[in-house]
Amino acid sequence: MACENCYLKPTFEMKSLIVLMLSSLLNIASAQNTPVGIFQANSDIGNPKKAGSTIYNEGDQSYTMKGGGYNIWFERDEFHYLFNKIKGDFILTANFEFAGKGNNPHRKTGWMVRETTDEKSSHISATLHGSGLTVLQWRASSGAAMRDPQDEIFAKDSSFNVIQVERAGKNIIMRAAYTGKPLEMIGSHVMENLPDEVLVGPFICSHDSDTVEEVKVWNVRIDRPVADNYDPGKSGNLGCRMETMDVSDGKRIVIFEKTGRFEAPNWMPDNKKLLFNMDGSLFKIPVNGGEPEKLNTDFANNINNDHCISFDGKLLGISHSRQGMPGGGSSVYVLPLEGGVPKLITENTPSYLHGWAPDNKEVVYVAMRNGKTVYNIYRNSIEGGKEVALTDIKAGEHVDGCEYSPDGKYIYYNGHYSGTMQIWRIKPDGSGKEQLTFDNYNNWFPHISPDGKWMVIISFPPDIDPNSHPSYKRCMLRILPVNGGEPMVLAYLYGGQGTINVSSWSPDSKQIAFVSNSGK
């Protein structure tokens, strides 16, 4: 027989306490699954004793992550995770730096690709330890014990600054780099049990249940690569990001994103806006981001990515395609920088503008002439007259990206005469040809800083056609002295055509702007 006094009846106070506790738990769960920066969620995995957190710093678009956890090892894991759900192939790239010396040399951070948020989930992690140890580690299936060394690939070097992970089908590839250096292949592993949709993102684990460690993550990019034979004309363009970068530290800021295509920013002389081409027109956008504003170019509505601003900041040169003209009809025009009616400079086509003379009276461009099937470098007065050929290359060779130095002594360009595409310079009369880069990359589009000291180039992989600068490739932006020297990497990006076809230096020579492809 039941006893009516054998249990306590809930009081109003008890109900209020229960509601408060449930509300607190819901708030914690909600906070952990709130989007942070470009990520959909952040959460502790495996219920670590010390809770983790992530703060997104909007000013520099970096992430400060804190996390505890005994380890990411054996049959289960404890750590803090910042992640997105993604299907298909991807490329993950970021800089990582631990805060302070830390309490355990085995604290770890990096990129993780994970099946679920379950503590026993299968995963593969590109890991940087507090000691500098850099390793690719994995759990092949849910609940399996991670083994040393069977489930690891160790890097020969240590203490890398940049970590990259790429998925190509079932294969997971890890690369890493020191600041200013190209990415190195660390290793790869086929993860047969990972589904098409996975979680991807950076993580932090203290390797000590009673401790919380901290890491800063910046230049975070998630790119969606396409097949090498992808044709944007047939299959559509990938999304784009407009980025700016401080060349002294390589920190990048995304100021504008779009699902369609835009290209080739110029930094405006007032240091307040960028100019870029999109959908056949030119647009201005504040350097800190905002809504693009269309520039008046009158009839010119088929403008490509070859446009540049005169040294005195008064005139704008564009390449606009005229319908029905040979070779696609690209022609060089000049108009006021504030907008207006373009004036035709090159009657013959095709002609692609790349630079101005420092006296603001001439332009330099590449063109096909006299029935030849190769491009050569030409200069011409903006007042008209006979154009002057500066190169005379052979069939199969290629030159492009011609640009004056601010002192007017040289014209820099990229040229393929044998082997890979490299950077060269000539004098304004075409004499004194001099090679400046000598590596295995295909180097394009030299852009000289306004102070005349530095050159930024885009470097394509060795395996592409040297005469081609295609879209959607794994590229680098690199910087070197104008007289030559070892290039230093500024950025690892997915891009190519339209990334930095024309000069995008800021007037103070401290920043550049460029376009990367997001895959959106």
What name fits each language-model region?
Residues 1-33:
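Bacterial Sec-dependent N-terminal signal peptides
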Residues 32-231:
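Extracellular glycan-recognition regions
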Residues 168, 238, 270, 278-279, ...:
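Short loop/turn segments that connect beta-strands within the blades of beta-propeller domains
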Residues 228-248:
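Blade/loop signatures of beta-propeller domains
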Residues 230-236, 256, 269, 274-280, ...:
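Beta-strand C-termini and the immediately following turn/loop, strongest in propeller blades
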Residues 239-241, 281-283, 326-333, 373-378, ...:
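Structural motif
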Residues 244-261, 287-303, 335-350, 380-398, ...:
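Multi-bladed beta-propeller domains
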Residues 259-275, 301-316, 348-366, 394-414, ...:
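Conserved beta-propeller blade repeats
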